[in-house]
């Protein structure tokens, strides 16, 4: 079984766009691991109207990310602060975890993203 964490920008996205991004991520990971079951590590659920501080959401994401076997960085992850922090942590503190990327830039260059530095 593969535990999948999806790092994706969510600001300004509709519920449908978020769900479609998740499906694309799952499909890409399934292509790489066709004989494995995939469990998506879901973010902390919030009740309608609840607006926690962004740093609270980021801390929760980092905690949940530690249980992942694969971290998938969705399109435009490079422009979202939280995604950049997740990528930094994944590279520098969790190097054993497989990182996969969905980005136009990555597909054109045909090379993996380098780990971000401070």
Feature map (PLM): residue ranges:
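Conserved catalytic or regulatory cores that recognize and/or transform ribose-phosphate-containing ligands
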Residues: 1-118
